[in-house]
Amino acid sequence: MAVPKRKTSPSRQGMRRSHHALGQQAHAECSNCGELKRPHHVCGHCGHYDGREVVAAGKDLKGTVRV
């Protein structure tokens, strides 16, 4: 069974983990109401997508993320 020959130093651990950081989420401005939303997603505030109303305004949107 394979076993490490030496203890991994903290600096080497950090170098290995340097690529594990999460990236920034992209945000776009809704063309209808100006609220921030995810690109290519229905606006969670007004229910518009691509200039059209897809979900009735005021209706609770299940599974939406408000940014």
Swiss-Prot record:
Q: Which keywords has UniProt assigned to this entry?
A: Ribonucleoprotein, Ribosomal protein
Q: Does the keyword Mitochondrion apply?
A: no
- Name the residue ranges with Basic residues bias: 1-20
In terms of Pfam families, this protein maps to: Ribosomal_L32p
Under the heading Gene3D superfamilies, the entry gives: Single helix bin
Give GO terms for biological process. Answer: translation
User: What do the Gene Ontology cellular component annotations say?
Assistant: large ribosomal subunit
Q: Where is this region: Disordered?
A: 1-23
Q: Which GO terms describe its molecular function?
A: structural constituent of ribosome
Extract the InterPro entries matched here: Ribosomal_bL32 (IPR002677), Ribosomal_bL32_bact (IPR044957), Ribosomal_zn-bd (IPR011332)
Mind telling me which PANTHER family this protein's record contains? Answer: 50S RIBOSOMAL PROTEIN L32, LARGE RIBOSOMAL SUBUNIT PROTEIN BL32
Give the protein family.
Belongs to the bacterial ribosomal protein bL32 family.
Q: What is this protein called?
A: Large ribosomal subunit protein bL32
